[in-house]
């Protein structure tokens, strides 16, 4: 059975995550004090029910040792997993402005910006030991729920999911990436007027990049690196690996290479997802 602990900065989507987990059959509890985690787990053990518990800055223990002790006191039949949701600072500020809700630390007479920064510091002990960190900055409520269903179902089956994610450096580096590869040195289809409005998913762009030896070399060496270390990652109780591929705008080169890598590992029987941050942002 799984005990999914959901945490993250306020406004990052914890309530959405908890609802998605409830739809997946988890017994969900919002804002349970950490010291009560073992009691909850023991009460559910005989019923063979997986549980999900949200922890925010208001019920954080005074020291990390209290959290570690609670984890050690869980029944052996439970496998604890920590999901940490986050978003960039500007996104969190915008979400609070849109909803006009008070930040949990607003009672300390802090500005919203200061409250967000202090919350980040207080939650760092949980973030540093998270099994999965999800950046929700560019996600809608429905996209977050669907992504969590896909990834967390994989985790419950102890299956490593490889996520290949393209992005544009001018939009920022994804904070949920385990590996980041920069492909801005490769030939750029952007400078061909016919290819400029297309994306790395279009055949003419793929044909352009496929003609260059350095593109083939980069793909080969990147997949060889991942193949070398993948067995170690799989045996390290890890269920996901996020590989981010970045070019200047996130439209041509990074998209093509992310798809090539995804297709390669998919053809070898791996559980693979691909995501294109810039293209998804243009659709929304």
From Swiss-Prot:
Chain's gene name: rapZ
Question: What is the recorded name of this protein?
Answer: RNase adapter protein RapZ
- A Pfam family annotated for this chain is PapZ_C
Q: Which domain of life is it from?
A: Bacteria
Which segments carry the region annotation RNA-binding?
Answer: 266-284
The protein's GO terms of the molecular function aspect are: ATP binding; GTP binding; RNA binding
Which keywords does UniProt give here? ATP-binding, GTP-binding, Nucleotide-binding, RNA-binding
What InterPro entries does the database record attribute to this sequence? P-loop_NTPase, RapZ-like, RapZ-like_N, RapZ_C
Give the matching Gene3D superfamilies: P-loop containing nucleotide triphosphate hydrolases
* SUPFAM superfamilies named among the record's database cross-references: P-loop containing nucleoside triphosphate hydrolases
Q: What binding partners and quaternary form does the record give?
A: Homotrimer.
**Protein task:** Modulates the synthesis of GlmS, by affecting the processing and stability of the regulatory small RNA GlmZ. When glucosamine-6-phosphate (GlcN6P) concentrations are high in the cell, RapZ binds GlmZ and targets it to cleavage by RNase E. Consequently, GlmZ is inactivated and unable to activate GlmS synthesis. Under low GlcN6P concentrations, RapZ is sequestered and inactivated by an other regulatory small RNA, GlmY, preventing GlmZ degradation and leading to synthesis of GlmS.
């Amino acid at each position: 059975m799984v005990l999914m602990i959901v945490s993250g900065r306020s406004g990052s989507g914890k309530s959405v995550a908890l609802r998605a987990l409830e739809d997946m059959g988890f017994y969900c509890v919002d804002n349970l004090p950490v010291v009560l985690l073992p009691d909850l787990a023991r009460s559910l053990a005989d019923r063979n029910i997986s549980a999900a518990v949200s922890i925010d800055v208001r019920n954080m223990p005074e020291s990390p040792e209290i959290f570690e002790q609670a984890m050690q006191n869980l029944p052996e039949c439970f496998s604890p997993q920590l999901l940490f949701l986050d978003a960039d600072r500007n996104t969190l500020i915008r979400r609070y402005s849109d909803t006009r809700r008070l930040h949990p630390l607003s009672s300390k007479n802090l500005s919203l910006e200061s409250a967000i920064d202090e919350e980040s510091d207080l939650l760092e002990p949980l973030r540093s030991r998270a099994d999965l960190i999800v950046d929700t900055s560019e996600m809608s409520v429905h996209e977050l729920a669907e992504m969590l269903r896909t990834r967390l179902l994989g985790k419950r089956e102890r299956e490593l999911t490889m996520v290949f994610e393209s992005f544009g450096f001018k939009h920022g580096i994804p904070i949920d990436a385990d590996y980041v590869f920069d492909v801005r040195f490769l030939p750029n289809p952007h400078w061909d007027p016919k290819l400029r409005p297309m994306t790395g998913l279009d055949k003419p762009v793929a044909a352009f990049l496929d003609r260059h030896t350095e593109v083939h070399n980069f793909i080969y060496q990147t997949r060889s690196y991942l193949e070398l270390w993948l067995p170690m990652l799989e045996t390290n109780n890890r269920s996901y690996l996020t590989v981010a591929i970045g070019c200047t705008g996130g439209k041509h080169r990074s998209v093509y290479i992310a798809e090539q890598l995804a297709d390669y590992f998919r053809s070898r029987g791996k559980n693979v997802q691909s995501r294109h941050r810039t293209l998804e942002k243009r659709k929304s």
